[in-house]
Amino acid sequence: MIEKLKNWWKWDPEAEKNSADNPVTALTDNQRRNTGPLLALAFGWGFLVTGLFTGSQLGNGIPFWPDIIVTTFLGNLANFIVGAIVGYIGYKTACNSGLLYRYVYGNVGAYIPVLFISILTIGWQGIVVGAFGITWTLALNPGIEAVDDIFSSSTFIITAILAGILYTITTYFGVKGLERISIPSVAVLVLVGLYAIYLNIIQAGGFSGLLSLSSALVAESQMTTVEAINIVIGSWIVGAVVMPEYTRFAKKGWVAIAIPFIVLIIAQWFLQILGALGGVVSSDSLFSAQLGIDLNILMQQGMIIGWIGIIGMSLALWTTGDANLYLPVIQTSSILKKPKNVMTVICGILGTILGLGLYQYFFEFLNLLSSLVPPLIGPVIVEYYLINKEKFHSGSFDGIASWNPSAFIAYIAGAVSTYYSPAFIMPAITGLLTSMIIYWIARKTLTR
């Protein structure tokens, strides 16, 4: 038994290189994935509870039509552009983010952005674990009336831990495991989502009733259109930044662009609209307050329909949970030189522990992510598209410096700029653009 554990823990670069997930080098053509399963995986990843939360927040801040439809589209479009730019680098180089950071931040310097993003994405995993626990706690304990009662409930603790174990087991099988759960889940997620939209509109008394409810709800709101767009951008800009983890598997360029399109323009936009409906129709519901959607509306349609809704929500969180856990696993495996399976268990345990207490700070955590992560990718974008893309295709890190001061100067400038962002632009975009500009200047100046 001890010998098996030693072998499991042991780093075998050749075995990792030849695995389906290959965290240590650029993928070979044989390691790229078929289009259908990869796009299904993207849809499952995009079905993240953030969309419901974001939509619910907007539903309580601006009119549903046409404001919410337009602002959510524009915000998702901005994230899609970033995701497509970054994701295309992943496709062309076949490299995960950890490898891309080595080319730009240096062989040693890359440890800082990789470990930083990994810690934050493990925290993101904790958010999804907590959401699963909340879903089942509210479903099994309809009498709960206070938020504190949710997190102290034994039902929450047990179901959150089970969710963490479930996500870890699926991710243990790598991208193949993610595809297997995503493919059958897509149809269920779409059907449940569409039915929930239909029921919300019926609950409001039709579309005209919905618009009347929306107008009355936001009559005293001070939220502006720009603020609404910024909320949407902040909710998924981090997902756009880590896009190479999945686009590297694409066999064709259009697939690399389709992945962020499906995640952001289709899945997230769909969820934001559903969440906005929930925010308008059920603004006083504990379900809506904690998950962005009131599953009680489905429960009122009968036990079968209600539990289909609960299971659909659970599937959405499952496909999101394992796809999120995969991100820090690949990044840490590539930089720490530990087997992917080992990092899956470690990251899964950490995410599960965080899931028991982090969900209460969802919006604070989201703001932290959206401010600190985007500037990290700015130097990668500039280096690839404007300075020296050839080195990304060399397949070797020989000759790469241990540290690249230009990248760290650019990141610090970008991160600081998020706190001084003008009101008309999202801090995340300010940070990203600042890091790109400063990196280009520093790279041209310091390398003369």
For the regions a protein language model found, what residue spans apply to each?
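Membrane-interface "cap" regions at the ends of multi-pass membrane proteins
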Residues: 1-66, 216-229, 248-253, 445-448
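Selective recognition of specific alpha-helical transmembrane segments in multi-pass small-molecule
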Residues: 48-51, 74-82, 117-128, 188-200, ...
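Hydrophobic, membrane-embedded alpha-helices of multi-pass small-molecule transporters
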Residues: 35-52, 199-204, 214-278, 301-322, ...
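Transmembrane alpha-helical segments of multi-pass small-molecule transport proteins
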Residues: 41-45, 114-115, 142-173, 187-196, ...
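Membrane-water interface regions at transmembrane-helix termini and the short interhelical loops
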Residues: 59-62, 87-88, 104, 112, ...
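Membrane-interface loop-to-helix entry segments
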Residues: 158-200, 260-264, 365-378, 429-437
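C-terminal membrane-solvent junction of multi-pass transporters and transport-like membrane proteins
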Residues: 378-448
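Hydrophobic alpha-helical segments and their helix-loop junctions in multi-pass secondary transporters
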Residues: 129, 134-138, 188-214, 228, ...
